[in-house]
C-alpha cells in the first residue's frame, strides 16, 4: 500500500467561499469579514475573486449591469468585491486578485497557439482547470516583502449549479486534493427564506444547494445561513444533519445593521475560531481595538451631514460603491454620519433644477463617468456650488467638469471636452496623446486607459497639500482625457488654480479655488476613493466632509430659486431634449 502524502503544517491554507440558491447573498462581504477576523487574529491573509464571465475584465462592462470597476495599484480593472477585500483587510491587492473566464481562456488559447501543449487536444479538463489552479496557487507565493500568506481566501463568483461556474468549482476541488484536505476549507453561503404565510423558515433550498455542491465532489466544511432573522438552534441542527456539516460549522448570519457589523456577527457565531481550529492555524485572540472604535463612530455619530452625489448611474448604487464608502469613512473621521442624496445629474441642467436638488445639502460630489449624458447637469451642479460657497469635490470626470465650468465663466461659452463634442471650438479637455488610437477606434478599448497609481506634486499651502499634509502623493487613475494645457492661462482668469500636476508639470492632477474665494471646491483627475479604508479614511474625503460639517454648522445664505418656466417654455425644452437624445447616448 503506497504511503500517504504528507502536507507541511506550515503550508499556506486555502479557503474557498461559494454561494447557492440565489445570487447577491453577500459572499464578498462574508469573505471580506472573515478575512478581517483572521487578520485581527494576527494571520497574514490575502484574497482573490474568481469571476465566471467571459469578459477579460469589467473595464468595458455597463456600470448598470456590473457596478463599479475597482482599479488596483498596478492598474488592473477588477470586480467591486476586490474593493471590499482591500477595505476590510486594509491592504493593497494586485491584479491577480481577480480572475475571469476571459483571462483564463485567453491564456490557454495563447499557449495553444505557441505550441506549448505539444499537440494535445485542449479541453476544459485539464487545461482550463489547470490554468485556474495555477492562478489560485500563485496567491500563496511570497509578496514583494518576502511574506508568505497564512491564508488565501478565494471567492468563487456565481451560484452553484451555473454552467459558467463549473470549471472554477472543479479547479477548487482539485486544489483541495493537491494541497491536502487539512490545508483547505470550503465555506458555502446559502439562503434560508422566511415564508410569511406559514411563519416558517425553510431549509430545503440549502439542502438542495449543498447536494448540488456535493454532486461535483465538494463537501462544505461550514455553511453561512443568510436570513432576515436568526436561525434557531433546532433548524441549525437539522441542516447540520442533512448536509453532513459539523454543528459548529453551521453559522446563522441575520441581516446586520451595517456592513461593518458583519465581522462581529461571524465572531459571535465563532466562525473564525472554527476555521483556525480546522486548519490548525497558530493564532491569537481577536484584537477589537480598532474595529470597536470604527463601530462606535458608525453607530453613535455626533451630527449628520447631507452630501449630494450627482451622477448618471445612480439607479444602481454599486456603480459608485467606493465613492459612497469613502464618503462614509470621511464622516467617521469627524464622528459624523454622511447621508448621501442620490441626485440624477440631468436634474441639475438648469439653474432651477440645481437649486431645487441641492438647496438642502451640505456638500456636492461629482464622481467619474463616461459619455455625454448628464454632463450639463454636472456642470450646472458645479456652477451652483461655486456661486453658493457649497463644498464640492470632483473626481476624474468631476475635475474635467470643474474646468469646463470655469472656462465658460470667463467667456469661453462653448468650452467642452473632446470626448463629448469633438467639434467644440474650445476643447479645454483633450484626448491624451497615447489614447488617440483607442478613441478613434483603431486600438482596443479594454485595458488601455491610463490605469493604476501615478505620482503628483502639489503646490505648497494649497488646500489639497494641507489635506494630504504632503506635497508629493500617489493616486490611482482611470481616464483617457486630460486638461488641455493650451487653455491653462485663460482658465486661471476664473480664479481656478492648478494646484497639483504630474512630476513633469504636463498633466493637471488637482484643481481648486483658493480658500478666500471658495471654502472648498476641489477636483482631482484621480480616483482617491479607491484608497480609502473605513479605519483609515482618505485625507481628501476627510477634508471634504470636514468642509461640509463646517458648512452645516455655519449660517447659510438664503437660497434664491429662479422662477419656474411657463408650461409653453417647458414644452419647448422637452422637445429639445427629445431632439438631443440620440446624440447624448
Swiss-Prot record:
ATP binds at residues 24-29, 81. Gene3D superfamilies: 3.40.50.880, P-loop containing nucleotide triphosphate hydrolases. Residues 306-554 form the Glutamine amidotransferase type-1 domain. One of its GO terms (molecular function) is glutaminase activity. PROSITE patterns: GATASE_TYPE_1. The active site is at residues 396, 527, 529. This is CTP synthase. The lineage of its organism: Bacteria, Bacillati, Actinomycetota, Actinomycetes, Mycobacteriales. The gene is pyrG.
